[in-house]
């Protein structure tokens, strides 16, 4: 059905967005990137289009290229909370520029202090900085706002383990398994439990 619509309106931005999102949902990031390139050639493309293009680049391992685009977005709009969060979380995952990651996520939380995803990122940045007590505080708050997020729950379990709170860690990991759908992630969580 979607492909039929695309054949009828191949240059319609709304249709192209739907197609790009379809490919992204199927983890076909390269096709999604090609479509976002077409969208970005349009004079009416938005910052959101650039964000989605950059996040797809990141998904195929082109973090350095994506990072340049994310910083361009932040230069244009320093209060773009989603970009601040994305970059902060990615820096934490890569364990690089943790001071900058902390600065960015704190800025996002000043704008949206009750955002569970942002609190998770702050918790994860603190975890990577080995500030485990601080990390637990933010991760517990994040879990209270996102009680079915397997990723956030898993992060909390990891943090409990670092604080030698093994029983609580296992409890959180078992809870995370209830909500996790990705098979590879399920295997990783089960390995932690065992």
Residue ranges, per PLM feature:
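Register position in tetratricopeptide repeats
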Residues: 25, 59-60, 93-94, 128, ...
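Canonical tetratricopeptide repeat
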Residues: 18, 52, 86-87, 121, ...
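TPR alpha-solenoid repeat register
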Residues: 15, 49, 83, 118, ...
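Conserved structural position within tetratricopeptide repeats
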Residues: 4-7, 40-41, 72-75, 106-110, ...
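Residue-level recognition of tetratricopeptide repeat
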Residues: 21, 55, 89-90, 124, ...
């Amino acid at each position: 059905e979607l492909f039929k619509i695309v054949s009828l309106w191949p240059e319609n931005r709304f249709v192209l967005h739907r197609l790009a999102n379809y490919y992204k949902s199927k983890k076909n990031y390269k096709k999604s990137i090609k479509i976002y390139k077409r969208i970005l050639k349009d004079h009416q493309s938005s910052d959101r289009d650039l964000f989605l293009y950059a996040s797809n680049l990141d998904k195929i391992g082109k973090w350095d290229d994506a990072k340049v685009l994310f910083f361009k977005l932040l230069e244009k709009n320093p209060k773009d909370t989603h970009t601040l969060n994305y970059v902060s979380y990615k820096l934490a995952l890569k364990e690089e520029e943790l001071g900058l990651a902390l600065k960015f996520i704190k800025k996002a939380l000043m704008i949206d202090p009750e955002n569970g995803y942002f609190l998770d990122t702050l918790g994860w940045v603190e975890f990577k900085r080995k500030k485990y007590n601080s990390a637990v505080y933010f991760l517990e708050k994040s879990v209270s706002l996102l009680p079915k997020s397997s990723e956030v729950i898993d992060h909390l379990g990891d943090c409990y383990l670092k604080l030698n709170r093994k029983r609580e860690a296992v409890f959180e990991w078992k809870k995370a398994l209830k909500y996790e759908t990705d098979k590879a992630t399920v295997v990783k969580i089960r390995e932690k439990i065992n």
